[in-house]
Amino acid sequence: MSVPDVSVVKAFLLDLQQRICDGLEQLDGEAKFKADSWKREEGGGGTSRVLTQGKVFEQAGVNFSHVTGAAMPASATAHRPELAGRSFEAMGVSLVIHPNNPYIPTTHANVRFFIAKKEGADPVWWFGGGFDLTPYYPFKEDVIEWHQNAHDLCLPFGEEVYPKYKKWCDDYFYLPHRDETRGVGGLFFDDLNAEGFDTSFAFMQAVGNGFLTAYAPIVQRRKETQYGEREREFQLYRRGRYVEFNLVYDRGTLFGLQTGGRTESILMSMPPLVRWEYMYTPEENSPESLLYSDYLTPKDWLSLNK
């Protein structure tokens, strides 16, 4: 197995953060990201970049973090008990984008690297990440294109890669208490190291680089779509699912909070405005009901493109 090079991973992640922020500023056309660097008492730190009240994006947060610690947190050792007691180093770029227009989907992406060390033993390391899409008023062609981009970036690494990580994404971004997926999925991978450092790193780079390629065309296509109070109210209601998932199920959120991460950066994924409504049910045969009937259970989206 090739030896992990932490400095090369960090350089890529910092560059990725910059490129994604540049791309989002270009899409917005007005607002700019504000950078906020922070240090963590136990070791490490990061830079959070947040764009607010833009022409296109109500809020977009793109966070880089590189943290170190003397012992692995419970969230990381729950499914890897053999790592308990090891020192660790974790770095990644994580982003969530909440658009103004309900016809533009919310999106999330994350790429990360983790290494755990113990004197007298080989380091244990892995990559993880992915991206997913959460529409409010979905367009089938947008969802198919999103999955086509995900498929195409996976293909050089093997034909089995996209179906495997697409299913993992569907399974991960699922709310059991609602019996629905958070959105229409994408890719999710974790514990990636079996192919060695170089190949694993190359795949993580492909996912990071592929995010804007997949998301930007959807934003361009939908950003001028007219909407009213009804659509806005539905968007705010559905944003509640984002909050529910992130605070109850998301491993990254739990890891950040358990390792003494910076709370503001961890919770910047939260939508700036959100609403809940008791016993809400969409009107039958309405555009809102289409989301529930056609988009919140896993589908083979690429088969619909044939």
From Swiss-Prot:
Pathway: Porphyrin-containing compound metabolism; protoporphyrin-IX biosynthesis; protoporphyrinogen-IX from coproporphyrinogen-III (O2 route): step 1/1. Residues 242-277 are annotated as: Important for dimerization. It is found in: Cytoplasm. The active site is at 108 (proton donor). GO terms for biological process: protoporphyrinogen IX biosynthetic process. Homodimer. Belongs to the aerobic coproporphyrinogen-III oxidase family. This is Oxygen-dependent coproporphyrinogen-III oxidase.
